[in-house]
From Swiss-Prot:
This is ATP phosphoribosyltransferase. GO terms for cellular component: cytoplasm. The keyword ATP-binding applies. Pfam families: HisG, HisG_C. It comes from Methanococcus maripaludis (strain DSM 14266 / JCM 13030 / NBRC 101832 / S2 / LL). It comes from the Archaea. Catalyzes the condensation of ATP and 5-phosphoribose 1-diphosphate to form N'-(5'-phosphoribosyl)-ATP (PR-ATP). Has a crucial role in the pathway because the rate of histidine biosynthesis seems to be controlled primarily by regulation of HisG enzymatic activity.
Amino acid sequence: MILLALPNKGRISKPVNEILEKSGLKISVHGRSLFAKTVDPEIKVMFARAKDIPEFVRDGVADVGVTGYDLMLERDTEEELEMLLDFKFGNARLVLAAPENSDVNSIEDVKNGMKIATEFPGLTKRYLEKKGLNLEIIELSGATEIAPFIGVSDLICDLTSTGTTLQLNRLKEIENVVSSSTRLVANKKSMEDPEKSAKINQVLSGIKSVMYAQSKRLIMMNAPKDKVSEITSVIPGMGGPTVSEILSNCNMLAINAVIDENKVFETVSNLEKLGARDILVVPIERIL
């Protein structure tokens, strides 16, 4: 049996749960319970704060978990965890920022003895040490942007996705510390256990199949027999399109293929010009 640690709330919780659901790993949640069953009796779920998950997985409390790369770095666990997957969402950057009217415009302007407010004291300290800087770190649990304007700090080190929040709070970015996204990580000892690693890889395979399918579409159509070669040349598909007989019409063939979502518009237009008809474009839940 394996225990999967998932964020109990926050912006990455919903999309992760949706991917697991689409992969077939349905989770039975009852109220505010911290533990849940899945359709697979060998896979249990634990809900926890995303910031605690790196340590839970590292220490073997959970076998596999979902968390942010920034949180792994904050807990200094990235070297002790097996990185399995980058979900490519929940993207953010941890940056140093200063008030717009500050004389600090780059990392070179930061001086020893300055104060910096952050929710990431460990990561901030290690970063500054690498830069040869010794600042007083003020740990906050939220609303970091206000710190320079109430005399708490000279700078902040905070997460930003687009930079809009910084601008709205009259702050300017002076240095990018690290880029982060949502990750699937595993306990290294669990990955060495044949039974546990098999289950973990099963979860990983399911997630990958959903993520891969998100950028694909199944396109189906009927086409004149004398146009099949031309039509199949514009929809190569995965290993080639599928062509089959239509029993009620000897002059037409049915063609199915999987194509990239960003090529649907152009492909459909080309198919219509070549005589394809009854064209259907369908989302795909999983591709294995």
